[in-house]
Amino acid sequence: MKFFIKTYGCQMNENDSEVARYYLEQEGYESAENENEADIVILNTCVVRKKAEDKFLSTIGELRKKNKKIGVMGCGAEKLKEDLFKRGVNFVIGTRAISRIPEAVELSIKGKKAAIFDDKLDEIDYRNILKRNSKHHAWITIIYGCNRFCTYCIVPYTRGREKSRKMDDILREVKNLSLNGVREITYLGQNVDAYGKDLNDGTSLAKLLNETKKIENIERIWFLTSYPTDFSLDIAREIASSEKIAKSIHLPVQHGSNKILKKMNRRYTIEEYYELIKSIREIVPDASISSDIIVGFPDETEDDFQQTVKLVEEIKFERLNLAIYSPREGTIAWKYFEDNVPRAIKTRRMAYLLNLQKEINKMLNESYLDKTVEVIVEERAKSGLFYGRDIRNKIIAFEGDESLIGKKILVKIKKTTAGPLYGDIIKII
């Protein structure tokens, strides 16, 4: 019997889908190339925004017409639970019960409904999950959940409280992957720099990075996503200490106004955020810092917005993920705050920040012209060019062929834009 997993949302969902595939294949189920070839279609879902939720709910309706067995995992499973049965779903798996997915599939084949939400994270045998969606790169979840409870965010309710994996288990996974051709890893967590705090044994992200950089064949180490007050300068020192650790730090700020930050329950002031960025840049002068910002949060005034503009102008992020605020059912903001910023104003403010960031990107990228950088080749783009990233997470495109994927090359930059950089391969390293 064949299954197909359709993944929505974040990188952690990508990793969870790899885990689910492993457990199903261990029980003899066969992975299909697409949903049309599959007897069972499993949707690994996202509900961070309403649009993402609507998308997978629409897919359920389409699959019902094709008479497929339907399973739902991910944050949508946690949010909607057994209510999904009313939509024709056959089984639902919680974010911490992925190792039990064969049990749910078996029950659905027998015509029974299955809903499994137990915390079975400790059962996951990550050391033997060697089949990844990329041959040279692996997503590695090191901490689950989030304790921060930002007022706009559904994640603590769908992913639970923070729970770290043992460091030895993570390092064994990385070593096994390195022996299987993986050269690049990304450590994942909703709040990755909180890693180890719940273990109460001195474990930390900085110590994990220190041990990981010693593993032979691993050429680049990434991590995301960070929370400002959990980001220790020991992490920055580890980045500065090794050419293996990417000089790319994703540090969501969400807003430039202290009033709005407090309303978001972000637990830091904008002055503290500025000071953190200053300290990071003192330790890692060439650090590439990216961020997230929400536009149009309840009670955001023009003055609040201008403080965000000032933040973006002064810090000059290398990359900025922008989102217009929309209430998410189940969050504190949805329950208690009026969504009182008109849509037209939200859209105008969003457009202004998009244009501002585009100009910043263009200016920052111009400094790359005629430079030679190390790139790990990822894949072919739709344009036909191949692309990869340098140690600062710049996307660089070039002429190449399939044999280069996963290899480290030197590229001389010949053209810059506000987005990708373009260059010529100098040599394979």
Curated annotation (Swiss-Prot):
GO terms for cellular component: cytosol. Its cofactor is [4Fe-4S] cluster. GO terms for molecular function: 4 iron, 4 sulfur cluster binding; metal ion binding; N6-isopentenyladenosine methylthiotransferase activity. It catalyses: N(6)-dimethylallyladenosine(37) in tRNA + (sulfur carrier)-SH + AH2 + 2 S-adenosyl-L-methionine = 2-methylsulfanyl-N(6)-dimethylallyladenosine(37) in tRNA + (sulfur carrier)-H + 5'-deoxyadenosine + L-methionine + A + S-adenosyl-L-homocysteine + 2 H(+). Residues 1-110 form the MTTase N-terminal domain. Keywords: 4Fe-4S, Cytoplasm, Iron, Iron-sulfur, Metal-binding, S-adenosyl-L-methionine, Transferase, tRNA processing. Residues 132-364 form the Radical SAM core domain. InterPro entries: Elp3/MiaA/NifB-like_rSAM, Methylthiotransferase, Methylthiotransferase_CS, Methylthiotransferase_N, Methylthiotransferase_N_sf, MiaB_methiolase, rSAM, rSAM_horseshoe. SMART domains: Elp3. Catalyzes the methylthiolation of N6-(dimethylallyl)adenosine (i(6)A), leading to the formation of 2-methylthio-N6-(dimethylallyl)adenosine (ms(2)i(6)A) at position 37 in tRNAs that read codons beginning with uridine. This is tRNA-2-methylthio-N(6)-dimethylallyladenosine synthase. It comes from Thermosipho africanus (strain TCF52B).
